[in-house]
Amino acid sequence: MTRRCSHCNHNGHNSRTCPNRGVKLFGVRLTEGSIRKSASMGNLSHYTGSGSGGHGTGSNTPGSPGDVPDHVAGDGYASEDFVAGSSSSRERKKGTPWTEEEHRMFLLGLQKLGKGDWRGISRNYVTTRTPTQVASHAQKYFIRQSNVSRRKRRSSLFDMVPDEVGDIPMDLQEPEEDNIPVETEMQGADSIHQTLAPSSLHAPSILEIEECESMDSTNSTTGEPTATAAAASSSSRLEETTQLQSQLQPQPQLPGSFPILYPTYFSPYYPFPFPIWPAGYVPEPPKKEETHEILRPTAVHSKAPINVDELLGMSKLSLAESNKHGESDQSLSLKLGGGSSSRQSAFHPNPSSDSSDIKSVIHAL
């Protein structure tokens, strides 16, 4: 029995040894030469192009990118974000770089509105960028500013510092002034002229008087041409106007001086010093300070030195020997002034005691 291929319906081989077999994935045989694209809704044109290319001469692989036109190959998937009409199907869309004007307006909005209000900066200042792009640009700007101390490899747009307020054009600083009516502008100009030249109201009267005088003088004089009189009057008028303008111009202040400030309130009284002492009072002269001497004590003998031999009774002291009866003939005493003292001394025995009794007692023992 001859083998029959289930793939090409030819005899002599089976589907496993078929030379025209394709790739089988999940039970489905894929016969397309290119499997990079699928037959999805976003790739129908490529699917049709590859199908039509398969019926060609066969010189190239059917469905290869070389057989597909540029506009067909550029369709691809809807989620791949390919550039439409590009020759390269894998070319990705690139963002447009920020210009200096956009970055300057971004810095101005960042200075006015602060960090975080990216929607306000995008709406009022950088109108060509979305809030997401403004936030991304701000993140790059802050990272660049935090790495200022490091070595910079190349200059960047983020190195620009915010300009001063004086360098910003007036239409950007005050955008609401464009809607001001013409009448208010005229009134503002009139008020400015009035404040700058308050004394200019009196100038026409002076000029008119001098002009009348010059006209009278020209009318009174005869024989002078009118052109000469008109030239003289115009020159005098020009000199007077220049003098008035020089008087009305404010004097320039020195760079280190302060403007003169006049007090807004004047007190009804003025303080001045008033002496309390009467007019004829003469103050006493100051007393001189007295000088004090330091007194130091000195040892002085007020009496003559005492002689020990002259002391009362000191030379009459004697120690007498006792007699044979055991009684002392002379007692150790101090005789003052030759008188006897009635006071009993500790060195004298009691005279009232009887010696016989003592002896008897001793003998009795």
UniProtKB/Swiss-Prot annotation:
GO cellular component annotations of the record: nucleus
Keywords: DNA-binding, Metal-binding, Nucleus, Repressor, Transcription, Transcription regulation, Zinc, Zinc-finger
GO biological process: intracellular auxin homeostasis; lateral root development; leaf development; leaf senescence; negative regulation of DNA-templated transcription; negative regulation of transcription by RNA polymerase II; positive regulation of cell growth; post-embryonic plant organ morphogenesis
Record-annotated HTH myb-type domain positions: 90-146
CCHC-type ZnF: 3-20
Tissues and organs where the protein is expressed, per its UniProt entry: Expressed ubiquitously, except in hypocotyls, root tips and lateral root primordia.
Compositional bias segments (type: Polar residues): 8-18, 343-355
Origin superkingdom: Eukaryota
Full protein name: Transcription factor KUA1
Organism in which the protein naturally occurs: Arabidopsis thaliana
